[in-house]
Amino acid sequence: MEQEAAMVVFSCNSGSGGSSSTTDSKQEEEEEEELAAMEEDELIHVVQAAELRLPSSTTATRPSSRYKGVVPQPNGRWGAQIYERHARVWLGTFPDEEAAARAYDVAALRFRGRDAVTNRAPAAEGASAGELAFLAAHSKAEVVDMLRKHTYDDELQQGLRRGSRAQPTPRWAREPLFEKAVTPSDVGKLNRLVVPKQQAERHFPFPLRRHSSDAAGKGVLLNFEDGDGKVWRFRYSYWNSSQSYVLTKGWSRFVREKGLRPGDTVAFSRSAAAWGTEKHLLIDCKKMERNNLATVDDDARVVVKLFGVDIAGDKTR
């Protein structure tokens, strides 16, 4: 919730100028990534300062939602939240009440079991045994993360195909597409991965026309399964300014969790037709081998100490 409140202030502050929709979209992405990278205490400080700057017109004038756990947002969207031991757990922001209510119901089933009070009375009964097993196989934090990233339905479907516990797509069922060694800018503060133009236009399922409204706007969202079976969602866009295809929103979190560094390789592939009924994209990381020579030298090095000083060390100048 704190991130959503902070985003409201960012929107209010940036909305006073006459910048173009493309600039606003890029700024919005950068703000989202900046908020996602903040520590909890830093984020709370931002929100408290933001609340003092909010104009009176941003106070909720819309009626509260008719659904449990759903709250209206000043930007016209709907938020979902659930309470766990008197602490609020934010489940994300959604385009309509029904989607937010669905997120609450999913969280309620995971947090409180089949006896949970949900927005749809038959929610627990309507949930398949496979979905309940899928929820039981994932921690509360994992389910909340899926809901916030809007990947729950995709991960559920993949989980149902493979069984309740998420299992990665096996090697034999992967069709390699292309690889890229990430650059310092790919894993830096720009929060984006530049996808090689030829590979993007050849392999990705939603090619963006360079002057289309989608490319000039927010692009499209693509889901990728990693080597652990986890689904990642990235925004895929075409930037006219640099004439490049990029993965933006969601990329910085991937970099942080995978510990990507310059020189590491990101490998893209696609599930084979024989694996499941629906093809999907996959992403993997290959870490560059570092310090191997130093390790060998250290292991082979003879240490002779005199009064605590290594007298057999390398004396080359």
Curated annotation (Swiss-Prot):
<dbReference type="InterPro" id="IPR001471">
    <property type="entry name" value="AP2/ERF_dom"/>
</dbReference>
<dbReference type="InterPro" id="IPR016177">
    <property type="entry name" value="DNA-bd_dom_sf"/>
</dbReference>
<keyword id="KW-0238">DNA-binding</keyword>
<dbReference type="InterPro" id="IPR044800">
    <property type="entry name" value="LEC2-like"/>
</dbReference>
<dbReference type="InterPro" id="IPR015300">
    <property type="entry name" value="DNA-bd_pseudobarrel_sf"/>
</dbReference>
<feature type="DNA-binding region" description="AP2/ERF">
    <location>
        <begin position="66"/>
        <end position="121"/>
    </location>
</feature>
<feature type="region of interest" description="Disordered">
    <location>
        <begin position="1"/>
        <end position="37"/>
    </location>
</feature>
<keyword id="KW-0804">Transcription</keyword>
<feature type="DNA-binding region" description="TF-B3">
    <location>
        <begin position="178"/>
        <end position="287"/>
    </location>
</feature>
<dbReference type="Pfam" id="PF02362">
    <property type="entry name" value="B3"/>
</dbReference>
<dbReference type="Pfam" id="PF00847">
    <property type="entry name" value="AP2"/>
</dbReference>
<dbReference type="GO" id="GO:0003677">
    <property type="term" value="F:DNA binding"/>
</dbReference>
<protein>
    <recommendedName>
        <fullName>Putative AP2/ERF and B3 domain-containing protein Os01g0140700</fullName>
    </recommendedName>
</protein>
<dbReference type="InterPro" id="IPR036955">
    <property type="entry name" value="AP2/ERF_dom_sf"/>
</dbReference>
<dbReference type="GO" id="GO:0005634">
    <property type="term" value="C:nucleus"/>
</dbReference>
<feature type="compositionally biased region" description="Acidic residues">
    <location>
        <begin position="27"/>
        <end position="37"/>
    </location>
</feature>
<dbReference type="GO" id="GO:0003700">
    <property type="term" value="F:DNA-binding transcription factor activity"/>
</dbReference>
<dbReference type="InterPro" id="IPR003340">
    <property type="entry name" value="B3_DNA-bd"/>
</dbReference>
<keyword id="KW-0539">Nucleus</keyword>
<keyword id="KW-0805">Transcription regulation</keyword>
